[in-house]
């Protein structure tokens, strides 16, 4: 499969704001929904350039669809890709700190 060239703004879709993600922030870990075509190198480059921080490592998870039902109608949630970005010591993403 040929990988398309993604711009840095297309790599990160949105930050994930959950109870678990807020606990991870204390360990310098930030969680993002990312483009399904993105890889670890693209995510690292995007976070470093967009937020002006240094990234230590990136973990990526493919989230599978979950079955859902509304009355007699059955369906699934969409599949998506999640990235957990660990920042180097002394760095935080100030734009995301005010959201909780």
Curated annotation (Swiss-Prot):
**According to its UniProt record, which protein family does this protein belong to?**
Belongs to the universal ribosomal protein uL23 family.
Q: Name one GO molecular function term.
A: structural constituent of ribosome
Tell me the Gene Ontology biological-process terms attached to this UniProt entry. Answer: translation
- Note the subunit structure: Part of the 50S ribosomal subunit. Contacts protein L29, and trigger factor when it is bound to the ribosome.
InterPro entries in the cross-refs: Nucleotide-bd_a/b_plait_sf (IPR012677), Ribosomal_uL23-like (IPR013025), Ribosomal_uL23/eL15/eS24_sf (IPR012678), Ribosomal_uL23_CS (IPR001014)
Q: According to its UniProt entry, what is the function of this protein?
A: One of the early assembly proteins it binds 23S rRNA. One of the proteins that surrounds the polypeptide exit tunnel on the outside of the ribosome. Forms the main docking site for trigger factor binding to the ribosome.
This protein's name = Large ribosomal subunit protein uL23
**Which Pfam family, any one of them, does this sequence belong to?**
Ribosomal_L23
What cellular-component terms does GO give this entry?
cytosolic large ribosomal subunit
């Amino acid at each position: 499969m040929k990988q398309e060239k993604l711009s840095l703004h297309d790599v990160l879709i949105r930050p994930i704001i959950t109870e678990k993600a807020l606990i991870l922030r204390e360990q310098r870990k930030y969680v993002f929904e990312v483009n399904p075509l993105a890889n670890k190198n693209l995510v690292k480059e995007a976070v470093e350039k967009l937020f002006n921080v240094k990234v230590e490592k990136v973990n990526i998870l493919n989230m599978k669809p979950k079955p859902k039902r509304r009355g007699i109608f059955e369906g699934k949630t969409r599949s998506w890709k999640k990235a957990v970005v660990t920042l180097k010591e002394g760095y935080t993403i100030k734009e995301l700190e005010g959201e909780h």
